Amino acid sequence: MSAVSGWWDDFFWGSLVVVELFFVALIMTILFGLIGAGAKLSNNRVAKSIASGYTIVFRGTPEILVLLLFYFGSAITLTTIAQIFDPEIKFVDFPPFWAGSFAIALIIGSYATETFRGAFLGVDPGQIEAARALGISSLKTFIYVRIPAMWRLALPPFGNHMLSLVKDTALVAIIGLEETLFVAEQAIGYTGKPFTMYIVVGAIYLGFSTIITFTVMGLERYANRHLEVTR
């Protein structure tokens, strides 16, 4: 492991980038998933069609292709807009961090849409009827009754989505974001030790995955605590 000794700082900062990317993409994933699930469960045909198209496209397209299309497509769009105001501008780069965050969130959000939709359908209708009988508005019922009940059902599969999300952060290395895999590629160029560097990256991601797994297990126990008490 002597080949890695001069790269620990770089791997540390690369790991922090992975953490930042994970949490930003996670927030957007939840938003995309909730919006998509709400649209698929609505009575609006247009909203249903858009949500269905979203899940079909992003679940059926290779993840690396989505990332590249989003990154370069955004850069081309920004460049076109900028050239309207200043024809001398040749190219406007889109920040790799935000391109990666949006692309990963769109991909995982398409899976989360179906997870949340199924969880919403699994909520006991009696809880909704009880809220209505108490005169609670539809919005408050959705926020305080349906979402908490839905989360209990959605947590196990959503934990898998979180694992997929953290692993997908490795893809952003191809658009120049300096995360752990990018650092490994740089280190390999200097040391000529690809196996060693990839083992380090694998260990880092395994550590992240382990933390996520135990976190989700803890959240599941918390969400089901009232069920354990009644047994």
Which residue ranges define each predicted feature?
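Transmembrane alpha-helices and adjacent helix-loop boundaries
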Residues: 1-231
